[in-house]
Amino acid sequence: MEIVYEGTFTEASQTDFNNQLTAAQSAGADMIFLPIYYTPASVILTQANAMGYAPTFFGVDGMDGILTAENFDASLAEGVYLLTPFSADSEDEMTQNFVAEYQDRFGEIPNQFGADAYDAIYTLYQAIQAAGVTADMSNEEICDA
């Protein structure tokens, strides 16, 4: 694999990627790595499609949620590779319980961000349980536990 183009953008310029896409296409890039969040990624996929440019897109966990991005045609994400630490399809019992409870409460399948928040709170819960923290303890007692 050879890197043929490297491009960047700023927060202020994340609504128009035509220059970067044109440069990547002109350089012959047949794969584009997107280590970004899903909102700018949805714009990139939309603009690439509009210009007829169809490289393979490879993203990371920040792109989890792209299918629910506002005003995004989710069909454009078909074939995008995504590396993420969470899969709602996991057969793990704890994951399936989380997915079911999340879906009941919010009416949608959770993405990696919801799973990360759950993991953070569950880790705190486990630490509190292991330390024997109770509601009547002072801040100092909790810290010492």
PLM segments and residue spans:
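Extracytosolic ligand-binding ectodomains
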Residues: 1-145
